[in-house]
Amino acid sequence: MVKMIALYKQPQDKEKFDEHYFQTHVPITAKIPGLRNMKVTKITGTPMGGESEYYLLCEMYYDSYESFKEAMKTSEAKASAKDLMSFAGDIVTLMVGEEVEND
């Protein structure tokens, strides 16, 4: 299983961010062909009780790296990327990883 991870720093206006993210961006992203699952986590703090520099984490799951690459070529993925850059381009870090089994 391959996943793309989007890690967002604290936005200046959390209410405005949440409204756009959940009402606009998530529905656009959910249309990407090959996307198997999308999990969103709001970061609530650090293990020591402090405030985290991060606000939100989104994990988007694909069957394989090949299916992920194909998905990124679609108009739906391009629409998601365009929307992402319009509201969070300065606070998001994107990465791709492959899940591994602990033996």
Residue ranges and their predicted role:
Residues 1-103:
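Macromolecular interaction modules
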